[in-house]
């Protein structure tokens, strides 16, 4: 076998590598789904609060849980695109993004359909869906900056305030968090 492919690996070594990649892939999907669910809880909590500051604070607990648990959230990874850790792993970003989007939307959609809690976010979603491309881009860049500050700040300081404050800023400024936006769309019952 090794001679056929011009390498010195044994079949058992190749199978171990393949199995390790399969495990890594399944962990990526699981961590991405859990991250989407945690952000979904943040969305639900945020729009359930009458006080926007309290809602923004409680939303930050979703990202805090994602970071503490080491889950895979697209918006926490994309800021590191130029780093060696992420370079060449575009497929992980794409898979993570889709798993985040599907899980946050599904949780919020099901919550809106089966919960007795009345959630009003149609105005928020309508505003986001009707904003111009330049507005959306500026708001997305603002969110990306806040997410990078949160994730990178926590990795360097281990201080929860470095997560909480940037998240509160992006929520209170109305920045566009692509994963959270899907949660809000799900809460409105949109497909």
Task: Map each language-model feature to its residues.
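Alpha-helical transmembrane segments and their helix-helix packing motifs
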Residues: 18-191
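Ala/Thr-enriched low-complexity intrinsically disordered regions
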Residues: 2-3
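Cationic, low-complexity basic patches in intrinsically disordered or flexible, solvent-exposed regions
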Residues: 11
